[in-house]
């Protein structure tokens, strides 16, 4: 199956396609991870984006039932240099081709991804249309111009749960080939789901929390009431997709939670929403940070952690007026983590659940528990 690709900078490409046929729109971002493609593809934070893998060959270990970060795939599609013609892993259940087709997503291969990565690095993230139906450049250009801009779409309401649920499994136990059972806990955390990854919930359970997940539009007053009754001891603000500044109501609710002095931890989008709630607007980066090899310095311990990253937006330096900066990214020197002054709130831009990625930042979940 052949596919045609048109980028907003007037670049027109063709390649081979697999998975779902059709016409797809999104923003190109590149990811530098060498492994963990299933976790990356199933991360809800990629909603509305085409993932360009810098790793030359993808698909060699297939896919399995336990490495998904969500039940659905919200990314617009996946682009790679080479697609592995076979897969081999004792946990694998199906090929990447079958996996994408089952989830209704397109995959692109036999494409010069090094060229694309350099283009994104030099020009910033680019809007794109990929089609197996339209082969004419001008028709694709018109279609892209008519499509919605990613910064104007509220993807959070698409990826969030529609109703409350309890999460009762811990992390994957490789020795026993199953997820750990939930521990008995005296501390309960309310997770606001802006697009939460399954392994973040697993880590919260593993560290000793009872976990209840709420939709993105849960009201602060409901959670404040639960906190005052002692039915929850903290609130977790999850990762998620899209432009944080358009989430006006969610930011207002977080401001109420902060004013109530409820212990909170924010990761990725949650980190950005907290900054906006305190009056310090986030900004869009040129091409973001996506990968599992990003060095971050912990300014409190003077140690360097290798972290997993997936974001296009960042908090401003001015946030230091209300928060102590705890972490910095050594690739870009941007703010990576903060501890708010006079509030029991911490947040980080990177992903301490490390799925996929290094395990060096998992202590942050214990720091969250220590706030309570």
UniProtKB/Swiss-Prot annotation:
The active site is at 268 (nucleophile), 351, 353. Small subunit of the glutamine-dependent carbamoyl phosphate synthetase (CPSase). CPSase catalyzes the formation of carbamoyl phosphate from the ammonia moiety of glutamine, carbonate, and phosphate donated by ATP, constituting the first step of 2 biosynthetic pathways, one leading to arginine and/or urea and the other to pyrimidine nucleotides. The small subunit (glutamine amidotransferase) binds and cleaves glutamine to supply the large subunit with the substrate ammonia. GO terms for molecular function: ATP binding; carbamoyl-phosphate synthase (glutamine-hydrolyzing) activity; glutaminase activity. Gene3D superfamilies: 3.40.50.880, Carbamoyl-phosphate synthase small subunit, N-terminal domain. This is Carbamoyl phosphate synthase small chain. L-glutamine binds at residues 45, 240, 242, 269, 272, 310, 313. One of its GO terms (biological process) is L-arginine biosynthetic process. Keywords: Amino-acid biosynthesis, Arginine biosynthesis, ATP-binding, Glutamine amidotransferase, Ligase, Nucleotide-binding, Pyrimidine biosynthesis. The keyword Nucleotide-binding applies. It catalyses: hydrogencarbonate + L-glutamine + 2 ATP + H2O = carbamoyl phosphate + L-glutamate + 2 ADP + phosphate + 2 H(+). Residues 188-372 form the Glutamine amidotransferase type-1 domain. Belongs to the CarA family. SMART domains: CPSase_sm_chain. Pfam families: CPSase_sm_chain (PF00988), GATase (PF00117). It comes from the Bacteria. Composed of two chains; the small (or glutamine) chain promotes the hydrolysis of glutamine to ammonia, which is used by the large (or ammonia) chain to synthesize carbamoyl phosphate. Tetramer of heterodimers (alpha,beta)4. Pathway: Amino-acid biosynthesis; L-arginine biosynthesis; carbamoyl phosphate from bicarbonate: step 1/1; Pyrimidine metabolism; UMP biosynthesis via de novo pathway; (S)-dihydroorotate from bicarbonate: step 1/3. It is an enzyme of class 6 (ligase). Its EC number is 6.3.5.5. The keyword Magnesium does not apply. Residues 1-184 are annotated as: CPSase.
